[in-house]
Amino acid sequence: MSSLIVKSLGSIVSIIARIFFFRRSRPVSNPRTTAHISYFRMSRKRPLSLQTVELKVRMCCTGCVRIVRNAISKLRGVDSVEVDKELGRVRVVGYVDRNKVLKAVRRAGKRAEFSPYPEPPLYFTSTQNYFVDPSKEFKESYNYYRHGYNGTEQHGNIPVGSRGDDRVSNMFNDDNVNACRLM
């Protein structure tokens, strides 16, 4: 009997406390305004600065492009999404955290990593990059959980040397009229 009285008094006290202490004011003047909705959905944290996030995502068809674009555009704070299927690059601009963008793409079922090279090089700059098989680029040493890079030791821009207008590969080509002929 006493436990029933204690439970009923506790519920009455919680209802009274909820009514008087946790009541939020809503604008009553115009019922069509949405100011009260945005007030309750405001983020409590400080907003992030505008960032450009570049990802390297394995995409094979237009369906993959659509899946990646939809997964990223659902994030709060994304301004624009640029997807390049041929290069396998995704550029996201907005007030977002780069790790959240990476996790959103991975949740969509795509293998993704941060792109260490912001712009594609004009041509191959080393033999290591020239003889790379693109099918083995996403291999078993994929560092999925640690930091988002695919285990390469090169991060950042590669210095590109200039070779001039004529390429070395065309110097001994038979199709080139001005080529060097050695017999």
Curated annotation (Swiss-Prot):
Q: Which residues form the propeptide?
A: 181-183
Q: Where is the lipid attached (S-farnesyl cysteine)?
A: C180
Q: What does this protein do?
A: Heavy-metal-binding protein.
Q: Could you tell me the superkingdom of the organism this chain comes from?
A: Eukaryota
User: Which controlled-vocabulary keywords does the entry list?
Assistant: Lipoprotein, Metal-binding, Methylation, Prenylation
Residues where a metal cation binds: C61, C64
Q: Which InterPro entries match?
A: HMA_dom, HMA_dom_sf
Q: What GO terms are given for molecular function?
A: metal ion binding
Report the sequence similarity comment from the record.
Belongs to the HIPP family.
The residues forming the signal peptide are none
Where's the HMA domain? 50-113
**Keyword check for 4Fe-4S:** no
Indicate where the modification Cysteine methyl ester is found in the sequence.
C180
SUPFAM superfamilies for this protein: HMA, heavy metal-associated domain (SSF55008)
Q: Report what the protein is called.
A: Heavy metal-associated isoprenylated plant protein 44
